[in-house]
Amino acid sequence: GAKKNVMLFSPEQTPNMYHVPYSFSALNTIDFENPDYEKYPALAKLKGLKAELNHGDVLYMPPGWWHYVTYDDISYSMAMRAFPRKIGNLSKMLKNIVWTRTIEGIMRKLLGQKWNDRNEKIAVLKVHSQKDM
């Protein structure tokens, strides 16, 4: 089987992740393996964990952790989600399903690429406007 490389970042690192509004991801133009620190200077502050997974390996990702995955060859993987046991995590899950996905879907249909461009700009501005940048 093919090797899979995973980078994990704790939820505390969210302010430097260039999180795209109304989504569950960072900017898709970021290459976390070869970051462009001129374009995305906050990436230099990230402290992540790396894991190399081979056929049959399992990786547990705690709730709220960011992950970036690359494959060395053609492959597939399977993710399983557990129902949240903590009320705080349950409310986040419901907000994500009911609010975030709905707003994203409606706005993407209404505005198309303009919506994506708007959110990408906001992601960058939010990170770069931090006091310690």
Residue ranges of model-derived segments:
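A short hydrophobic beta-strand segment most commonly corresponding to one strand
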Residues: T29, D73-N89
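Ligand-binding loop in jelly-roll beta-barrel domains
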Residues: N54, W65-M78
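Double-stranded beta-helix
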Residues: G1-Y60
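Short, charged/polar low-complexity linear motifs in solvent-exposed/disordered segments
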Residues: S23-S25, P35, M78, K86-I87, ...
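Short, glycine-/Ser/Thr-/acidic-enriched flexible segments
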Residues: K3, Q13, W66, F83-R85
